[in-house]
Amino acid sequence: MRTVTIVGASLAGLYAARELRAQGYDGRLVVVGDEPHPPYDRPPLSKDFLTGRTDEDRLALTDAEESAGLEAEWLLGVRARGLDTQARTVLLADGRTLTTDGLVIATGATARRLPGAPADVHTLRTLEDARALRARLTEGPRRVVVIGGGFIGAETAASCAALGHDVTVLEAAPLPLLPRLGPEMAAVCATLHHRGGVRLRTGTGVTSLRRTGSVTAVELADGHTLTADIVITGIGAVPNTAWLAGSTLTLGDGVLCDEGCATALPQVVAVGDVARAGGTRAEHWTSATEQPRVAVTNLLAGRTLATSRPVPYFWSDQYGSRIQFAGRYRAGDTVRVTEGELLDEGPGEAGFLARYERDGHTVAVLAVDRPRPFTRARRELGRTAATATT
């Protein structure tokens, strides 16, 4: 391959560039990013950056020395608008066309918005999003309504509460994170909200947003109305695949690819939040750093030589606690606390470790403020999973 183009200049795109050079690719390397910034770390946006404990210069994932060493052409602040797979060209929004022999799709995802939501309803996905919300939060005490009790919603609510704002979280399900963690551990997350001084309203949705110039209230399906100065939505993300419409790639909640991140076209792979690898779109920091290794191996080989089905892992920092989860939860799994304790459906002072069991086997582990026991349990889970697939 004479030219490889990476579309997407965030975490997965950067790791793909590193892997290409690490695996010996010495041809032309082009990285296209729709944001004007070099790659930056997104997890702190809802936490330390929002609260002012971290500034923008601490978010950088790379520096000038590494960028020079990668010998890549960085085309930042320009969006890809199309892909011609027959001509092997990437069409850019500024009118330029890039001819490429290999393509890494790493375009990530965009925060999902409420239908018809006005511009002053905040999301938190990009640095621009975080800048805008941080500026609003420094204007003085505000009544904040967070729509969505997932990880982004919970982390954002915790940060707003830490800054002294009056915060309410709305979650349509009976408990936050119920599909991801199951009822026992979802109840723990609910307790963290309560302990953090945040009101949690579950089991109801949003019917409309009341405005008087800007948003002033959130109207709920149960008939109640919440007064709000700031409204934030954390209701998931949509993979950035619109630019691939009309290409020969198969799309469906992401770019469909095998467990080696290879698409049906040998010269195209996908990584990160946009990749639906082996039937799953992982959407986690760890996946974005691990997938590029096998993707690049297969891209350079022109066929799938390497596959990876790691045990899913994610973490979340909220209300001064770190939640870590590894594995695959399924409704009906038995959950046992094996270290530490639960007090009133919340973590004890020293945290806890819980195991999810199915048919006598551990299939997932969750810890709150127990990093070392969790690391051991995660390794054990990984060994078990590897044995099961050999």
Which role does the model predict for each range below?
Residues 10-14, 36, 109-111, 128, ...:
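Residue-level detector of alpha-helix initiation sites
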Residues 26, 74-83, 87-91, 98, ...:
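A Rossmann-like FAD-binding core segment of flavoenzymes
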Residues 132-181:
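Rossmann-like NAD(P)H-binding beta-loop-alpha module
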